[in-house]
Swiss-Prot record:
Required co-factors: Zn(2+)
Gene: hisD2
Positions with a binding annotation for NAD(+): Y130, Q192, N215
Chain residues that bind Zn(2+): Q260, H263, D362, H421
Keywords: Amino-acid biosynthesis, Histidine biosynthesis, Metal-binding, NAD, Oxidoreductase, Zinc
Family of the protein in this entry: Belongs to the histidinol dehydrogenase family.
Lineage of producing organism: Bacteria, Bacillati, Cyanobacteriota, Cyanophyceae, Nostocales
The species this protein was found in: Trichormus variabilis (strain ATCC 29413 / PCC 7937)
CDD domains assigned: Histidinol_dh
Name this protein carries in UniProt: Histidinol dehydrogenase 2
Record text on cofactor binding: Binds 1 zinc ion per subunit.
Amino acid sequence: MLRIITQQADVKAELQRICDRTHDEQVLHKEATVREVLQAVKRQGDKAVLHYTDEFDNQILKAEELRVTGSELDAAYQQVSKELLEAIQLASRQIEAFHRQRVPKSWVHFGDDDIVLGKRYTPVDRAGLYVPGGRAAYVSTVLMNAIPAKVAGVPRIVMATPPGAQKAINPAVLVAAQEVGVQEIYRVGGAQAIAALAYGTETIPKVDVITGPGNIYVTLAKKLVYGTVGIDSLAGPSEVLIIADEGANPVHVATDMLAQAEHDPMAAAILFTTDPALAKNVQVAVERQLVDHPRRIDTEKAIAHYGLIVLVESLDAAAELSNEFAPEHLELEVKDPWAVLPNIRHAGAIFLGYSTPEAVGDYLAGPNHTLPTSGAARYASALSVETFLKHSSIIQYSQTALNKVAGAIDALATAEGLPSHADSVKRRIQQDE
């Protein structure tokens, strides 16, 4: 059952326990397995990818079957309803519109003495998107990862996703990928997919940036290949924290908590409220909705282990506790969310008001749903167009400008014991004289 505790209890310790839920001893064993997979794929390429696809996904493939064919992509449209296709297209438009507003612009400043300074943004050459399989068809993951890459101007976007029964990929995932400009799709999942994207194989291209969520093996693989390639983040299990007052609908709050818990047995769903009656009513509503929940086993585990209701003294106290937890998703189900918002410093995405469930942001509001988890919102942000961009500094000095700063550069280079640095300026000054 969903627990209710008061602020006087050791709330911070309980929140820390939930935040640290992925830091168990088994991770070390899993990391050793992942290292083995990475090295095998790096050395053996397709052969290792096919071996691990058989071992972990129970699908026997040939190298030529790794890439999804054009006929499969065409057939996927026949298997998707008109309603779903229209929903994908609506979500795509809104996500793209939001991300186009956030594209950083290159700039150049012309200063005194013909000094030119600036910053130039350019996309990576190749982006690799990972889309999980397993519990659901993650259509929204395709959109949220591919669209920022497309908006950034990445010329080659490839996707990896694990094969299901009979080597099939969910048709909705294939349709979504085509709608947003993914050029290549490979049926490979897990750590072997991350390795293939990071190192390249005979069939799968090496990319520059890998994005997308996955299980602990995928996350560890991304951690270990970072440096060889860029990554978006190290995402843990999903989480929602809801701050609610007496005006919130307990059935809605309960549903929002279950919407998070149904993701994964390790997902976290937390409620902070000032109203004891709401706390009790949410507890009851959660139990009622669990009875016939289609994903009851996993959802019930998440609620039992990582679900929590905390009675707080005030909304200010709730905001401060929320900042310490730094949730991936934060819902402000209060009468005046804009009054609470200034007190929120750390959250991946913030949903304001009684009519803004997290699902709006998950699917089609526009902001990205790939968010920092496990407290990382203290220092990290959502996936964005900038994930797929680099920026280069632009610097040009005239001879006049160089003459004016030569002494300062000489002093700094001499202090650091780097004589050739100083000479590189001195000789240009002497040449000018």
